[in-house]
Amino acid sequence: MELPKEMEEYFEMLQREIDKAYEIAKKARAQGKDPSLDVEIPQATDMAGRVESLVGPPGVAKRIRELVKEYGKEIAALKIVDEIIEGKFGDLGSREKYAEQAVRTALAILTEGIVSAPIEGIANVKIKRNTWADNSEYLALYYAGPIRSSGGTAQALSVLVGDYVRRKLGLDRFKPSEKHIERMVEEVDLYHRAVTRLQYHPSPEEVRLAMRNIPIEITGEATDDVEVSHRDVPGVETNQLRGGAILVLAEGVLQKAKKLVKYIDKMGIEGWEWLKEFVEAKEKGEPKEEGKEESLAESTLEETKVEVDMGFYYSLYQKFKEEIAPSDKYAKEVIGGRPLFSDPSKPGGFRLRYGRSRASGFATWGINPATMILVDEFLAIGTQLKTERPGKGAVVTPVTTIEGPIVKLKDGSVLRVDDYNLALKVREDVEEILYLGDAVIAFGDFVENNQTLLPANYCEEWWILEFVKALKEIYEVHLEPFTENEEESIEEASDYLEIDPEFLKEMLRDPLRVKPPVELAIHFSEVLGIPLHPYYTLYWNSVEPKDVEKLWRLLKNYAEIEWSNFRGIKFAKKIVISQEKLGDSKRTLELLGLPHTVRDGNVIVDYPWAAALLTPLGNLNWEFMAKPLYATIDIINENNEIKLRDRGISWIGARMGRPEKAKERKMKPPVQVLFPIGLAGGSSRDIKKAAEEGKVAEVEIAFFKCPKCGHVGPEHLCPNCGTRKELLWVCPRCNAEYPESQAEGYNYTCPKCNVKLRPYAKRKIRPSELLNRAMENVKVYGVDKLKGVMGMTSGWKMPEPLEKGLLRAKNDVYVFKDGTIRFDATDAPITHFRPREIGVSVEKLRELGYTHDFEGKPLVSEDQIVELKPQDIILSKEAGRYLLKVAKFVDDLLEKFYGLPRFYNAEKMEDLIGHLVIGLAPHTSAGIVGRIIGFVDALVGYAHPYFHAAKRRNCFPGDTRILVQIDGVPQKITLRELYELFEDERYENMVYVRKKPKREIKVYSIDLETGKVVLTDIEDVIKAPATDHLIRFELEDGRSFETTVDHPVLVYENGRFIEKRAFEVKEGDKVLVSELELVEQSSSSQDNPKNENLGSPEHDQLLEIKNIKYVRANDDFVFSLNAKKYHNVIINENIVTHQCDGDEDAVMLLLDALLNFSRYYLPEKRGGKMDAPLVITTRLDPREVDSEVHNMDIVRYYPLEFYEATYELKSPKELVGVIERVEDRLGKPEMYYGLKFTHDTDDIALGPKMSLYKQLGDMEEKVRRQLEVAKRIRAVDEHGVAEKILNSHLIPDLRGNLRSFTRQEFRCVKCNTKFRRPPLNGKCPVCGGKIVLTVSKGAIEKYLGTAKMLVTEYNVKNYTRQRICLTERDIDSLFENVFPETQLTLIVNPNDICQRLVMARTGEVNKSGLLENLSNGSKKTEKAEKAEKPRKKSDEKPKKKRVISLEEFFSRKSK
């Protein structure tokens, strides 16, 4: 694939900058001051390297490069087949092995090393015999279900390659019997009907033609449990559907026949003339018409049907209600402080507007920034929404070319607020938000989520298409919207329409901003016969016809109307009507969305809205009368000359998810250097403080010994003689030390004790000595604090050089656990930008390779729109300020620590433009190199959708069982069930994340160092869209597990555990199986579960992987979790494997990562030299990124056919060919450039910078403001919101906190050691510090006041009120009994909701104000009265001793 010169230069420039950074990092690393002498982040290889690593054979990459350069990709693939079969890459043993290797390698070359086609798609390659014919040998390709993911072209090519391999091996062709042919005919049809609709459903004749002529057998394994009637066909091993084979034949060979013919010609393969004839015949012939014949029963039924007179829109609404029900799933949980913006599908919520702005699509909604302001800025740029449809979540970005809210002001006036500045001006005067405004949602999101298309609301981009269509049909003038048109055509059209040509030109070029005046819009409708312009169309169908009829009569009888005239067209200019006369019809005007003012007791409708109201009503010349089964617009269109389309059919609900994020990544607590200081640094882990106080720290740390002078210490370079030291390995039993060279000779085993050596030991260090030396080395003395870590969590326990920490402290930056410095940000997609938006001059952009705007005009102005290159990113100014500090740190590091020239020399953040970063996302396998091209004043990271999609995610299928402990009880549950045990779901960076457990849940992991099974906290659980395929690993004893192709898998190799990507794992690799015995129903708990030993090394075993299969994913989602510390989990039948990767979305400067990242620092790399976890992709290939982005639409406007099809409630997949998507360009140079958008915006950073949620303090204030917004939005029931906040957030929190108090751990204030039970002497056995509770009373009842406010002020269910009051009683009774001396006497408060409940039910309140006397108001029973009588003395129990506080208890003990 040849790219245009500009794009090729772009990638070459990126590679040059990458190579430059690597050269500098290599020079620095070569000095020996770091754990490794080389850079530890490898670059991803080119296509040839990918092919070799994916499918082999070894050594083929070099030859592929040579052949591709000489012959091109297609011929090179065949040449490689020749060389493999000739044995140039080694003896493969059998002809079948040669055939399999040749097919996989050739296909990998043709698909440029994409994983799915050569590995997962082809299950097997066999040489079989035509036993039913002449017993000759032929080649059979066995396809698996995941071949679907490789695309039709790759499927078809695999058949072509198979035929070439067959010829090279001298095999005969496949000679199918009639049984074989009819079996495939049945399978294709059955698959289409019973499993899933094929993109191309070939006729039986087409299937027979292909089967008779394809020279190899297309077969495969059973993929679906659907039996066929053509059973026991010779040579076919299954009687079930072979999904892979069906897809290859139908969607591969037959659907892609035309494309395949081009490859046949290019590669010179003979014997496929039949396919050329098939293509020619198909192009000449008439398309087949299905379903023309009608049965007698159907025709009779048709005759007996009763014709019901029903309006078009009325019937559409009925069909809409029947087929697409509102979905309240997103609104079932409402978090305190995060508003619900619209109830499900409620009119007045977000109005659906199909399209993709230059900063939306790809699970991102565009909304008018005025909407953000008028919802009290709870929505800001980058805020995440939980949505009703098409997906579950979206990020918000600003779009100014769509409609904003329609609001009612406190004086009764109604106003359209499409402008950001107007929103700021009127925000304090808004009483009600009648209509929330538009949400631009991409067609691609509907395709991705397979959501039925909702009827499109009438909008400017639809109207302009009808406008140009009418011009063409009536006047035969061809014009195009959203582009420059020929002057001649413009002149001709403007003559016909009698309008200014310049206005027509501008309106066609930008119809979203340039709107005709109302009188001209009416003129267009009359002349061209098109509906009234949507800007002047009111929400007629939001109002009942009877209400419009009443309004019509009032206007006819009482309104004062000022009329005007335009070219013989009469239109209203002003309407004045008394508010008293109007009465409740004032609400009708409001619901119509008609702007008007209220002044001096009159309702005044000014220009142009007077015409917008009266023109559809025929200027009151015909009588509007309500009609059964007719919507308002149906009645108007039946009577009026000027027709209307509905602008308000489809509404979508949403609530606020997670607020936007853009801040530096800090460990908790923040760390400046990965150096252990133990208890010597105090609770702040301050190394400088420990040094000043002359303390000695005792920590687990790796030491190194100088082979020359014998110096021992944590430094990698000897401070005395400058020699690179050797790591000292230590025997944990006898404490003998062995330098690396000696330990290697002993196979890292102590020769005395026969125990595995460790690379670290518990040693004493003197911080003062080490810090003074480091300060001298880098000449940094004035830092206030130097924050280290309590202890190293890595398996090597190698510390960072203290010099790095000093330089970080000097520049005020913080390190992450792997040695890098990161900045987190919410992902937001962008495909086009204006130079002024990102603060970059045109001259600078030209230097970066941006020479033209997106329309191909030379770049000369800061207001031109430019298409973003795929690996360029636009960071927030917050990120810019922080990365500037990081750049200064890196320069200091190079200069003061490594003695190399400074690299960035940045004084202001604009100096970072053009420099490279690495982008990482949650649960990903690789970083992607990006280039900074600008900064915006918004808390998001804008980047190309390809860039965001390149950060892949890895997980397990939902039915994977995992070993966990729930409320103290060990049990196995599925990952899907685990996900449901967490709450507070948010959508971030393309995955769903939940962090808040509903119960006390921990996961079991294996400490690979000790072999013990240990309990680990769960940081979060995730749910991600599933890939089309998974890898299934089957072990020698029958156990198995499945995972995504790129997921890390723990395997045992060369005496140690290492991590491999799933696709790298080979048959014969060994995995750990823990042979622990688990009593799932046991309810007993142990004193300290952290030391629980459910399994040990001698009871565990290593099992070989016997079989690896690529299988089709059965679910739409995959799941995983982040387990703290050990980062592995026990799944299915006790198989131990790695969890998902756990990094949050972040960027880091490339050179910082290359200099400072080390696998030796990573906590999950326990024991052994493992593969580096971070690989960077240097050249982005859209074919290899997350397939979600392949559905992104890339057109300038949606065609008229699309809007009309939405009225039929079609599946988006039926319109896949109508709107161009990224998928349509894959494999072509155009996949990188020429992408278009439908909606422009004035500024990608226009809108609130920070959500109000982040600015407010306590929960009560957040909830109050949340409910104020709910009250204001017509589409929201605030009482329902209050109920949901209580039931989904506050009550579970109150009850959960109450439960956690009784199960809490105890903590040492000094060293932070935690205890399940407190030591008897009340002091920490580790450091002698004070022991305190980890859950306080304040933490338990922090939401109680908020909850009581809600049940007092809002109409919630009585049951909910009582739950709150009972919870308050439980809290009070707990603390009365535990800490009686701290309880104050409760005074009866008549305003308290709970005490009022008691009084209402009993007529009295007990002294504590609790609900103990709550009854149903009936008289006491005799039994109850007896129960209240005082007991006899003998029955009385002795009084309980006074309960004392822990504080008092501990102080007494210590005296």
From Swiss-Prot:
Role played: Possesses two activities: a DNA synthesis (polymerase) and an exonucleolytic activity that degrades single-stranded DNA in the 3'- to 5'-direction. Has a template-primer preference which is characteristic of a replicative DNA polymerase.
Superkingdom as given in the UniProt entry: Archaea
InterPro entries named in the record: Hint_dom_N, Hint_dom_sf, Intein_C, Intein_N, PolC_DP2, PolC_DP2_cat_dom, PolC_DP2_central_dom, PolC_DP2_N
Region (Disordered): 1409-1440
Protein's GO biological process: DNA catabolic process; DNA-templated DNA replication; intein-mediated protein splicing
Protein keywords: Autocatalytic cleavage, DNA replication, DNA-binding, DNA-directed DNA polymerase, Exonuclease, Hydrolase, Multifunctional enzyme, Nuclease, Nucleotidyltransferase, Protein splicing, Transferase
Matches recorded under PROSITE patterns: INTEIN_C_TER, INTEIN_N_TER
Name of this protein: DNA polymerase II large subunit
SUPFAM superfamilies found in the cross-reference section: Hedgehog/intein (Hint) domain (SSF51294)
One family name in Pfam for this protein: PolC_DP2_cat
Catalytic reaction annotation: DNA(n) + a 2'-deoxyribonucleoside 5'-triphosphate = DNA(n+1) + diphosphate; Exonucleolytic cleavage in the 3'- to 5'-direction to yield nucleoside 5'-phosphates
Chain intervals with Basic and acidic residues compositional bias: 1419-1438
Family: Belongs to the archaeal DNA polymerase II family.
Organism: Pyrococcus abyssi (strain GE5 / Orsay)
Post-translational modification: This protein undergoes a protein self splicing that involves a post-translational excision of the intervening region (intein) followed by peptide ligation.
Subunit structure: Heterodimer of a large subunit and a small subunit.
GO terms, molecular function: DNA binding; DNA-directed DNA polymerase activity; single-stranded DNA 3'-5' DNA exonuclease activity
EC number(s) per entry: 2.7.7.7, 3.1.11.1
